[in-house]
Amino acid sequence: MTRMAEKPISPTKTRTRFEDIQAHYDVSDDFFALFQDPTRTYSCAYFEPPELTLEEAQYAKVDLNLDKLDLKPGMTLLDIGCGWGTTMRRAVERLDVNVIGLTLSKNQHARCEQVLASIDTNRSRQVLLQGWEDFAEPVDRIVSIEAFEHFGHENYDDFFKRCFNIMPADGRMTVQSSVSYHPYEMAARGKKLSFETARFIKFIVTEIFPGGRLPSTEMMVEHGEKAGFTVPEPLSLRPHYIKTLRIWGDTLQSNKDKAIEVTSEEVYNRYMKYLRGCEHYFTDEMLDCSLVTYLKPGAAA
């Protein structure tokens, strides 16, 4: 596998991203557990077939991503923004691969170490408390599920170049991300970016995901192609996110007293506003969730 030439990373930029991620994901593991399913997965589930439970649908989402990667036993999978470790565990147990996870959350790092240590396997498992900017080891495949929102538009070219260069000629990657639309796209679909919508998006990227910026699906495709990837038609998961958000909101609401006890009423209200608001805007087709697959030339041939 080819190693890429290192590009210096700004210490200030890296430190800021650490602070942004920890501001959200290190609120309290006990708090997130009050509305997440037992997989501790914090991203859009995949309800196919529709009668799946949330836990089953989260595994279906993980499998949907992994199945697009053509993983073989003994390969090494890099999980960028690995959350609480469910995707890595699934990959090891189901596909017999080595895994490396990247996270900027201290809480997630600690839990991932426990999850990976509990797997009965001889495969290599490691989780690193660092960003993709500082990672340059060769890997065979890459998965990134709803971490892309944290990367920043100005870093997309660097991200895709780095991912392209650390994979072999037949490398594959999936990136799943919440997305917004350009005002021109909304106008073409008979939608209008209202002040209320813009204010809610600002609320998300300042109070829920500090430093975050939603891409458009077109940006995800264009920057990937610019780096050399072939990008098949992206998959919209919007209906699945509506259902995921509704379940999360209902579950957190039913655990209101416990949520306030482990955090505060302000945190509870902020997350209820986030979950209910996102459900509304996904339903209204103002937001979407895209699963995009990236193929290097050897995989696209």
Swiss-Prot record:
Signal peptide range in chain numbering: none
The organism's place on the tree of life at top rank: Bacteria
UniProt binding sites for S-adenosyl-L-methionine: Y42, S43, G81, C82, G83, T103, L104, S105, K106, N107, Q108, W132, E133, I145
UniProt-listed Pfam families: CMAS (PF02353)
Gene3D superfamilies: Vaccinia Virus protein VP39 (3.40.50.150)
Gene Ontology terms, MF aspect: methyltransferase activity
Keywords of this entry: Lipid biosynthesis, Lipid metabolism, Methyltransferase, S-adenosyl-L-methionine, Transferase
Assigned EC number: 2.1.1.-
Pathway where this protein functions: Lipid metabolism; mycolic acid biosynthesis
Example of a GO biological process term: mycolic acid biosynthetic process
Active site residues of this protein: C278
Enzyme class, broadest EC rank: transferase
Family assignment from sequence similarity: Belongs to the CFA/CMAS family.
Chain's role: Involved in the biosynthesis of hydroxymycolate, a common precursor of oxygenated mycolic acids (methoxymycolate and ketomycolate). Probably transfers a methyl group from the S-adenosylmethionine (SAM) cofactor and, subsequently or simultaneously, a water molecule onto the double bound of ethylene substrates, leading to the formation of the hydroxylated product at the distal position.
Subunit note: Monomer.
Protein name per the record: Hydroxymycolate synthase MmaA4
Organism from which the protein derives: Mycobacterium bovis (strain ATCC BAA-935 / AF2122/97)
